[in-house]
Amino acid sequence: MSDINATRLPAWLVDCPCVGDDVNRLLTRGESLC
């Protein structure tokens, strides 16, 4: 079950604009750190 939830989580974040923006911001920050 956890694997399925983990797979659906990104899609759910993409569906939610507000959360998606936060995630994109974190991903961008992570790429900057790398």
UniProtKB/Swiss-Prot annotation:
Expressed in basidiocarps. The keyword Transcription regulation does not apply. There is a cross-link at residues 11-17 (Cyclopeptide (Ala-Pro)). The keyword Cell inner membrane does not apply. Keywords: Thioether bond, Toxin. GO terms for molecular function: toxin activity. There is a cross-link at residues 12-16 (2'-cysteinyl-6'-hydroxytryptophan sulfoxide (Trp-Cys)). InterPro entries: Amanitin/phalloidin. Processed by the macrocyclase-peptidase enzyme POPB to yield a toxic cyclic heptapeptide. POPB first removes 10 residues from the N-terminus. Conformational trapping of the remaining peptide forces the enzyme to release this intermediate rather than proceed to macrocyclization. The enzyme rebinds the remaining peptide in a different conformation and catalyzes macrocyclization of the N-terminal 7 residues. Residues 1-10, 18-34 form a propeptide. Toxin that belongs to the bicyclic heptapeptides called phallotoxins. Although structurally related to amatoxins, phallotoxins have a different mode of action, which is the stabilization of F-actin. Phallotoxins are poisonous when administered parenterally, but not orally because of poor absorption. Belongs to the MSDIN fungal toxin family. This is Phallacidin proprotein 2. The lineage of its organism: Eukaryota, Fungi, Dikarya, Basidiomycota, Agaricomycotina.
